[in-house]
Amino acid sequence: MLKKILPVLITLAIVHNTPTAWAAEAPKTDSFYLPKSLDLSPLRLHNIESNPYGKDFNYAQQFKTLDLEAVKKDIKTVLTTSQDWWPADYGNYGPFFIRMAWHGAGTYRIYDGRGGADGGQQRFEPLNSWPDNANLDKARRLLWPIKKKYGAKISWGDLMVLTGNIALESMGFKTLGFAGGREDDWQSDLVYWGAGNKMLSDNRDKNGKLPKPLAATQMGLIYVNPEGPNGKPDPVAAAKDIREAFARMAMNDEETVALIAGGHTFGKAHGAASPEKCLGAAPGEAGLEQQGLGWANKCGSGNGKDTITSGLEGAWTTDPTHFTMQYLSNLYKHEWVLTKSPAGAWQWKPKNAANVVPDATDPTKFHPLMMFTTDIALKVDPEYKKITTRFLENPEEFKMAFARAWFKLTHRDMGPAARYLGDEVPKETFIWQDPLPAANYKMIDSADISELKDKILKTGLSDTKLIKTAWASASTFRGTDFRGGDNGARIRLAPQKDWPVNDPAELHSVLAALMEVQNNFNKDRSDGKKVSLSDLIVLGGNAAIEDAAKKAGYSISIPFTPGRTDASQEETDVSSFAVLEPTADGFRNYYDAKRNTLSPIASLIDRANKLELTVPEMTVLIGGLRVLDVNSGGSKAGVLTNTPGQLNNNFFVNLLDMSTKWTKSPKAEGYFDGYDRKTGKLKWTASSVDLVFGSNPELRAVAEVYASDDAKEKFVHDFTKVWEKVMNLDRFDIKNN
């Protein structure tokens, strides 16, 4: 919902209001003293120890015990039980809760998968204090009695989305359904929301382009400025902003129009007076006595008729608590003229406007209709106009489009439908869910697994090629929105099969050999068993690592659980999967400088974060993959071993060897040559990603563990453990059970 700007907030501190003297003595991070120091905090986020429910807590199992109908009944009661401390407009909190759910989900962006409703991040800074989220702190407080009642059985993330659904349904709109499964976070995510901390500053660069991975056009907004770009009431320019922002949040033009038109059917905007004169600090800056609430309003009653949120004022329809076609009909039947709200914000009113909208608190008073600049944009933009007029002429089509778009908005960041919980999950599947076919065959058993591993190793494929393929397939996973991974074997499909990082020609030959093994195993069987290519890809990687460990003198067996299935090209949205392409993968020593804004090292940390790795896991994984010789393009950078293809700790031993002197390579930026200090002979080449494990004190501390004489077996054990983790990151069918 394109709502709610608070121009009063110019800057935002993401800490509690603390006396200056105390702040000066507070502990500081390394970056305070050394701004160029490497920040490893993304790999320490959401540690299980920070979860008060403990390491054995299983949210999926808790949710399955929830009486969802009882929760819905309680939500319906809250909707129409107005509280004196924050009265409901028109006696119904429904529109308020729709905005809460929308803004919780609407931070999602396609390029890095960050944002969205999963985790309930709206509770934390900076989102809690964003101007676009003004007064949503009260919405969550209204829901606290319900959260308190059901506790661990329903997360804040699920409760907020469910409440948005119930709000829509209570006002006469039929939603598509609801899926639970959003597990709460316990701290703020580390997300790049834009350059600087000035609220409402333009996120575009000096060339007018919105840098990736950003989606919102201004700092502190969910999408775009409803007054127009940077507060300028230009509907044509606003349409351009809308199209770009919504596209970066995975919405096409039709979905965008449906969401705006559907959302603005309900409720009103609040701009009773000047925010600069009336409002206090946002929650993150408010005093302790406010107990986490912000934007205290000192003007009038401070709420109700005196409420100030966005600075814009009024409603889009004459019936703001029911689903009608009025938004679209009002948009076209009136000539709209520019005006200002009581707070001084740009908005639009009908020419010769009549007082037809009932007051939110006094049924004897009426006001004119209003529209945002972003609403008028849907009328003046040629493509949006085609859609809005079609929806106006076809109400049932509009209803279905809004229902589908709302479901997508509130579930897009949850990943595949295998993560969905509850009895209200729609039966229909959608291409944006990255659907997978169900297995209609019996799974392979332990004897079959041993047989298949043996056959894979006898194909003539090298261990290196098998490991590279398994890594390329599984490492597309990103825990930010649970997309990617090996399940589906989409590495054989467009666009993944052609990504440069995957060495397409080599990949094709490996997949062809694995498919031959698959076909030979599956054909003419009477026992009903089959093996998927996606299972074989992982099994091949496992077999190769076991073989590499054997060559190094270690006997290991990597656990394997079958059950992956193979998606078709028709089940794969090429443009949607394109955003998963690794333009940098430090684990394969790959970096495309032309397509990256992060450095190779920062890109490694970012990818490790998406793979849900800790600092030790990232470290041991790098060390193992280097000696297994799996670099993209066959690069020997960082292959610090004389026995490539053997799983051992040589990478760390040789990296920390003081007989090597490292110098910058004259051949390529970001690469280094390692020379023997005595003879001057070239021993190794390495990238910045390799050398950071000897340069950064924290990474070196972990590297020293694995380089130690008594850690050889530990290294092999730890590497295979984290390898297994990465191969199974997308196995939600296992995790939820």
UniProtKB/Swiss-Prot annotation:
UniProt cross-link Tryptophyl-tyrosyl-methioninium (Trp-Tyr) (with M-249), position: 102-223
UniProt feature coiled coil, ranges: none
Any one GO molecular function term: catalase activity
Any Pfam family the entry gives: peroxidase
Binding positions for heme b per the UniProt entry: 264
Active site residues of this protein: 103
Gene Ontology BP, a term: cellular response to hydrogen peroxide
PTM comment, free text: Formation of the three residue Trp-Tyr-Met cross-link is important for the catalase, but not the peroxidase activity of the enzyme.
Keywords carried by this UniProt record: Heme, Hydrogen peroxide, Iron, Metal-binding, Oxidoreductase, Peroxidase, Signal
Cofactor: record remark: Binds 1 heme b (iron(II)-protoporphyrin IX) group per dimer.
Signal sequence residues: 1-23
Tryptophyl-tyrosyl-methioninium (Tyr-Met) (with W-102) cross-link, chain position(s): 223-249
Enzyme class: oxidoreductase
Annotated EC: 1.11.1.21
Family: Belongs to the peroxidase family. Peroxidase/catalase subfamily.
The protein's assembly and partners: Homodimer or homotetramer.
Free-text function comment from the UniProt entry: Bifunctional enzyme with both catalase and broad-spectrum peroxidase activity.
Entry protein name: Catalase-peroxidase
Name of the gene: katG
